[in-house]
């Protein structure tokens, strides 16, 4: 298993080689966290990526408590009131739904049977409830 001296076992998808990845699936018992947020204006006092940075950090800290895999963050979410502001990326809900649907299929194909979204953006709440209710995988 890939380790570093400070944090112990690394369970971050993108940092593992193929052999470590296979072991991580077993270690995680098939559980994966997918951080999701959005890129949006938060004023001049906070980064545009605040939502995804928070969601990613929560997922990484959780993986240090429980052996669960962490997927690279998804920087796209449902943006309403600031969708036309500088730095904001606003995609359609259909595109995000289809992306998440295919992503869940691919994550399952790779050996994960329990997918947990770690949401850092309030605008995603109802959308994710809808997605989880209607998706064929979850």
Residue ranges, per PLM feature:
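Short catalytic helix/loop segments, enriched in acidic residues and glycine
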Residues: 51-63
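A generic structural signal for alpha->beta connector loops
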Residues: 30, 67-68
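Short glycine-enriched loops at secondary-structure junctions
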Residues: 68, 74-77
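Active-site and ligand/interface coordination hotspots across diverse enzymes
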Residues: 2-47
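Active-site histidine-anchored catalytic micro-motif
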Residues: 9-16, 78-138
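Glycine-rich loop at the start of a catalytic domain that most often binds anionic cofactors/ligands
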Residues: 45-52, 83-87
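Short, acidic/small-residue loops that bind anionic groups at enzyme active sites
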Residues: 61, 65, 137-138
């Amino acid at each position: 298993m890939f380790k570093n001296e400070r944090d112990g076992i690394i369970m971050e998808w993108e940092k593992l080689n193929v052999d470590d990845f296979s072991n991580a699936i077993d270690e995680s018992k098939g559980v994966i966290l997918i951080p999701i947020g959005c890129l949006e204006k938060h004023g001049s006092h906070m980064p545009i990526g605040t939502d995804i940075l928070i969601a990613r950090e929560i997922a990484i800290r959780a993986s240090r408590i429980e052996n669960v895999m962490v997927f690279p963050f998804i920087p796209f979410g449902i943006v309403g009131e600031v969708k036309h502001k500088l730095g904001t990326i606003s995609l359609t809900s259909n595109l995000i739904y289809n992306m998440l649907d295919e992503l869940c299929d691919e994550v399952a194909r790779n050996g994960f049977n329990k997918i947990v979204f770690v949401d850092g953006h309030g605008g995603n709440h109802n959308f994710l409830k809808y997605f989880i209710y209607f998706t064929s995988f979850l």
